[in-house]
């Protein structure tokens, strides 16, 4: 057993009343009970003394006082302040460190979303992406963990969590843009027409995966897929001079019935086993709130993308 501390640099400051100053709160990260400690307001405060660089607050346990801007006081003597960083403390085994590092992005995303919901400010920017540390090795999600040992300097624990694989591939001429493709990209960017909704939703879904928000990714991608399927079926009705699209659509609500509608019309579906690869992933997520893992979500999104690309060749609105 050992004692560990971590410094969590917040993506966005948390605004607090004076009663929160110096307080500690418990949470569970990867099955480990972690204490999150807030910095303290000084007993006396002169707004002209402390700089914005060093901050106004006193570090928990008086660690990293000079190296970290823990937060700023906004109103005195009311003691309204904002926090930039928190100190994390727990007792445990060194083997638990990597599991905490691995689970922290999920925990942080959930925490940030709870703050967003509680504040009602849904326009807040997204959390910062991970970075690779230039000094000290490892990756950085906003949390750095150190081991406390008596009469020894702090020992930094490297974040060696596994990242989602980055595909490295040799570039062939077929993958490179020719002059007509580049010209079309610039023309489309300057067009008054917007990108169609299925592609915009698909982009949002992929971004949700990056944030480990797998449920949102699956549900958003399903909405994109429904839009694309309906657009393809409507085009079939127009091409065959059929006038009952709106009536028939009311009989084929929900994604599963829309796939059956494609089969009824003889429209090819690019993903042959769509029941297993798409519906069996989307339905329990949407209806029962089940959470998928990275691999199943990534495979699901790729299958959704295949269908959307086949059914929506025109990227811009008509």
Which residue stretches match the model-derived regions?
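Long, hydrophobic, amphipathic alpha-helical segments used as structural scaffolds
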Residues: 112-126, 232-236, 240, 289-293, ...
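Intrinsic-disorder-associated interaction segments
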Residues: 93, 97-100, 104, 172-175, ...
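Charge-enriched, short contiguous segments at helix-coil
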Residues: 71, 76-87, 93-99, 264-318
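General structural signal for secondary-structure boundaries
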Residues: 89, 93-96, 119, 180-181, ...
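Long, contiguous, compositionally biased segments that the model treats as domain-scale units
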Residues: 1-130
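A broad, structural surface signal
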Residues: 109, 230, 306-309
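Alpha-helical structural motif
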Residues: 107, 201, 247, 251-258, ...
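Helix-loop junctions and short alpha-helical segments
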Residues: 126-265
């Amino acid at each position: 057993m050992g004692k560990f501390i971590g410094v969590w640099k917040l993506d966005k400051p948390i605004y607090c009343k004076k009663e929160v100053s110096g307080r500690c709160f418990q949470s569970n990260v990867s099955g480990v009970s972690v204490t999150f400690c807030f910095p303290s307001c000084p007993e006396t405060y002169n707004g002209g003394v402390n700089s914005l660089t060093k901050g106004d607050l006193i570090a928990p346990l008086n660690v990293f006082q000079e190296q970290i801007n823990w937060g700023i006081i906004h109103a005195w003597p009311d003691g309204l302040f904002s926090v930039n960083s928190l100190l994390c403390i727990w007792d445990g085994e060194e083997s638990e460190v990597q599991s905490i590092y691995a689970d922290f992005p999920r925990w942080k995303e959930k925490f940030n979303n709870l703050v967003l919901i509680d504040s009602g400010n849904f326009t807040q920017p997204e959390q910062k992406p991970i970075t690779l540390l230039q000094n000290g090795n490892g990756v950085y999600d906003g949390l750095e963990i150190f081991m406390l040992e008596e009469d020894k300097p702090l020992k930094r624990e490297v974040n060696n969590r596994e990242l989602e694989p980055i595909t490295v591939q040799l570039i062939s001429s077929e993958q490179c843009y020719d002059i007509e493709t580049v010209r079309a990209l610039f023309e489309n960017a300057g067009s008054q027409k917007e990108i169609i909704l299925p592609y915009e939703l698909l982009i949002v879904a992929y971004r949700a995966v990056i944030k480990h928000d797998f449920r949102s990714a699956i549900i958003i991608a399903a909405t994109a897929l429904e839009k694309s399927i309906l657009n393809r079926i409507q085009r079939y009705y127009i091409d065959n001079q059929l006038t009952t699209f709106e009536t028939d659509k009311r009989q084929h609500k929900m994604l599963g019935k829309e796939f059956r509608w494609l089969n009824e019309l003889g429209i090819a579906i690019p993903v042959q086993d769509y029941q297993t690869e798409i519906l069996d992933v989307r339905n329990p997520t949407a209806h029962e709130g089940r959470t998928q893992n990275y691999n199943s979500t990534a495979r699901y999104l790729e299958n959704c993308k295949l269908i959307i690309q086949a059914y929506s060749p025109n990227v811009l609105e008509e």
